[in-house]
Amino acid sequence: MDEILVDAAQPEPALRVAEMNAFYGERQVLRDVAFEAQRGSVTAVIGPSGCGKSTLLACLNRTIEDVPGARWRGDVLLRGEETACLSADELRARVGLVMQQPTPFPFSIERNIAYGLRFRGVRNRRRLREAAETYLDMVGLLGEIDGDVRRSALELSGGQQQRLCIARALALEPDVLLLDEPCSALDVASSATVEAAIGELKKCCAVVVVTHNLAQARRIADSVVCMDAGRVVWQGGCAELFEEKRESVLAPLYGSELL
């Protein structure tokens, strides 16, 4: 596999992907995918249904390795470090993934956050409580529950559960946080709170969001990766895509769906 060339004059991206290919049995679903994501930014991955967006996230987090008959290959670097030598658990601590419509663990809000903190070796109960409050506040949830972290996570609304699962992933302090269609099952008000939380997340890591919603991508993203048939067909700044490349890039992908 070709060596990834790095420009020493440029800041090292939080995530660098090159030559990523993925297969389900004999069917190839990703073809030589390459892109970068910077800390302090939100990268939206968009494209028609079935183009490989969710498979891309599964490869980055290696959950694809749990799928019978699936395989992948490619280069994934975190802050310039090759990840091939990392165990699945080590990688997943550094590349957090919140799936579409995630479900919190069926116990207290605090224990949901403590799950990730204990993975990092935090055992002191006071530190667990303080850290849980910090991450819940980061996603705008602490005030909504009046600071009662002992409440059952299953009592929360759909949007609140979504943000709790994001906070749980943040507790591992990942280099990159992957979000798969984070607002697909939420109402307008809940979607707005999740989008606001995403804007805060990029302060502590690179955020990669898969979304079918072009309006949402335009609201939250700093950069965009456009996919079609398993390939990256365009990538660049969000403003450039929606203001200059709308007809040349988006129209062929979305057709009549593009308003």
Features from the language model and the residues they span:
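Conserved ABC ATPase signature
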Residues: 151-156, 160
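Conserved ABC ATPase "signature" region
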Residues: 80, 126-147
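ABC ATPase NBD Q-loop/coupling interface
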Residues: 75-90
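Catalytic Walker B motif of ABC-type/P-loop ATPase nucleotide-binding domains
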Residues: 177-180
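Conserved catalytic motifs of ABC-family nucleotide-binding domains
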Residues: 173
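C-terminal boundary and immediately downstream tail of ABC-type ATPase nucleotide-binding domains
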Residues: 239-259
